[in-house]
Swiss-Prot record:
Enzyme superclass (EC): oxidoreductase
Protein name listed in UniProt: Dimethylaniline monooxygenase [N-oxide-forming] 2
Topology within the bilayer: Single-pass membrane protein
Membrane-spanning segments: 510-530
GO cellular component terms attached to this protein's record: endoplasmic reticulum membrane; membrane
Modified residues (N-acetylalanine): 2
Subcellular location: Microsome membrane; Endoplasmic reticulum membrane
Pfam families named among the record's database cross-references: FMO-like
Catalytic activity: N,N-dimethylaniline + NADPH + O2 + H(+) = N,N-dimethylaniline N-oxide + NADP(+) + H2O
Biological source species: Macaca mulatta
Cross-link entry Glycyl lysine isopeptide (Lys-Gly) (interchain with G-Cter in SUMO), positions: 492
Positions with a binding annotation for FAD: 9-13, 32, 40-41, 61-62
Superkingdom per UniProt: Eukaryota
Gene name linked to the record: FMO2
Length: 535
């Protein structure tokens, strides 16, 4: 008899969790509190309590080829970076292709998830839901929480003395939808993450002046990278990931600074991060430097105090006649339907094994999907999480002891702090390629490079030097997809397809890049064996 699994949320994590459950022969039921799929990526004009919210102009920060699910490439005519409506279209195509909607109960709110009295032996959960004012309860063999972490706004008003005196308008960035109504105003945006930067840029085109306050500074990257390719298809390769892991810390920090400053000198713009950490999640925005050059946006330090109409900053400067303050200060974790002890966040540390499993449960029948912030696309990340989780639920994969899991949680947190810092916004940060490989290894889907070097050297070179895409994790192991190799080698074609809207005369060049990659791979292998010989 198939195990019954409760999937909470029908956003990206919920949809892929449904598919993974079906692939493994489990019986899923998804509870979605709204009337449609898409989660945070479905734009609505009205902000709803308990639901993630985006502004109308949101475009993905990760490209389509690095964001698609591993056995379902996005249509080749889709743009590389998708408007939220286009991404929602992909989710609809995906849900229809794999017939997922029949598993979803819409407009159904999960009120509570509690262990059954015999949990220590059964591992079962009692899930109480509400729909149309009527409560129902059901018992499930396992639970997958797929609600994400972008719906409870974090507004640290106590950190802004004088906010109670401020006569202008202030609100969290989740309430921002479009620039209408802000024309001619002087606006202060607090927080320079992706949302804060996007909003500042958009408002700067019609506002009188926009100021953006950043505590530590930030790196700003363009979506356009080498030779015009999407940034993540160049940045996220196994070769680059290996270099970051084996080179000394000071060298890695220098390399990152050089790479980030290729586009523009961040120090000259007052943006260079002022901390000791190797990595800080960059802001993806193609317009920030130009808006700074135009004077439409001005970078400010931390707000020290607010008056009725002005903002006083830590460097002693004052900006008068502020009309609006927008807090782009992130989100707090909240799972009101869970017991407090189930998913604990203490001192900015999430007590989940590999950001997924509570370590203290007697039975491994509960998991969080998508509760992570990788330096890359969340979609392939959530998919690998769900693939592993469903195999754990089936008993095909097993978790280590509680002690081993707790040691991993502590060690992972120490590494996260060393790389990214201790602030709340960095709580879920992790290295992208390393984490994907880690999950793939658990399910037996990580590519075997030593074997591929002899069996399929062309593929081995592509996997090592090319983009670390999701297709790689369908080449072998459970869930193998026969189209994976072809998808890897036709990736460039799908990247360029939406750009080639003007016919040009054909020109061919000698493929020296492939030969250089072969030589580079040989050099890496030789260096590795030499190191073994001398160690």
């Amino acid at each position: 008899m198939a195990k019954k699994v409760a999937v909470i949320g029908a956003g990206v994590s919920g949809l892929i969790s449904l598919k993974c459950c079906v692939d493994e022969g489990l019986e899923p039921t998804c509870f979605e509190r709204t009337e449609d799929i898409g989660g945070v990526w479905r734009f609505k004009e009205k902000v709803e309590d308990g639901r993630a919210s985006i502004y109308q102009s949101v475009v993905t920060n990760t490209s389509k080829e690095m964001s698609c699910f591993s056995d379902f490439p996005m249509p080749e005519d889709f743009p590389n970076f998708l408007h939220n409506s286009k991404l929602l279209e992909y989710f609809r195509i995906f849900a229809k292709k794999f017939d997922l909607l029949k598993y979803i109960q819409f407009q159904t709110t999960v009120l509570s998830v509690r262990k059954c009295p015999d949990f220590s032996s059964s591992g079962q959960w009692k899930v109480v839901t509400q729909s149309n004012g009527k409560e129902q309860s059901a018992v499930f063999d396992a639970v997958m929480v797929c609600t994400g972490h972008h719906f409870l706004p974090h507004i640290p008003l106590k950190s802004f003395p004088g906010i109670e005196r401020f006569k202008g308008q202030y609100f969290h960035s989740r309430q921002y939808k479009h620039p209408d109504g802000f024309e001619g105003k002087r606006i202060l945006v607090i927080g320079m993450g992706n949302s804060g930067s996007d909003i500042a840029v958009e408002l700067s085109k019609s506002a009188a002046q926009v100021f953006i306050s950043t505590r530590h500074g930030t790196w700003v990257m363009s979506r356009v990278s080498e030779d015009g390719y999407p940034w993540d298809s160049v940045f996220h390769t196994r070769f680059r990931s290996m270099l970051r892991n084996v080179l000394p810390r000071t060298v890695v920090k220098w390399m990152i600074e050089q790479q980030m400053n290729q586009w523009f000198n961040h120090e000259n713009y007052g943006l260079e991060p002022q901390n000791k950490y190797i990595m800080k999640e960059p802001v993806l925005n193609d317009d920030v430097p130009s808006r700074l050059l135009c004077g439409a946006i001005k970078v400010k330090s931390t707000v020290k105090e607010l008056t009725e109409t002005s903002a006083i900053f830590e460097d002693g400067t004052v900006e008068e006649n502020i009309d609006v303050i927008i807090f782009a200060t992130g989100y707090s974790f909240s799972f009101p339907f869970l017991e407090d002890s189930l998913v604990k966040v203490e001192n900015n540390m999430v007590s989940l094994y590999k950001y997924i499993f509570p370590a203290h449960l007697e039975k491994s029948t509960f998991a969080c999907i998508g509760l992570i912030q990788p330096l890359g696309s969340i979609f392939p990340t959530a998919e690998l999480q769900a693939r592993w989780v469903t195999r754990v639920f089936k008993g095909l994969c097993h978790l280590p002891s509680e002690r081993t899991m707790m040691m991993d949680i502590i060690k992972r947190n120490e590494k996260r702090i060393d790389l990214f810092g201790e602030s709340q916004s960095q709580t879920l940060q992790t290295n992208y390629v390393d984490y994907l490989d880690e999950l793939a290894l658990e399910i037996g889907a990580k590519p075997d490079f030593c074997s591929l070097l002899f069996k399929d050297p062309k593929l081995a070179v592509r996997l090592f030097f090319g983009p670390c895409n999701s297709y790689q994790y369908r080449l072998a192991g459970p869930g193998q997809w026969e189209g994976a190799r072809s998808a890897i080698f036709t990736q460039k074609q799908r990247i360029l397809k939406p750009l080639k809207t003007r016919v040009l005369k054909d020109s061919s060049n000698f493929p020296v890049s492939f030969l250089l990659k072969i030589l580079g791979l040989v050099a890496v292998v030789v260096a590795f064996f030499c190191q073994l010989q001398w160690s």
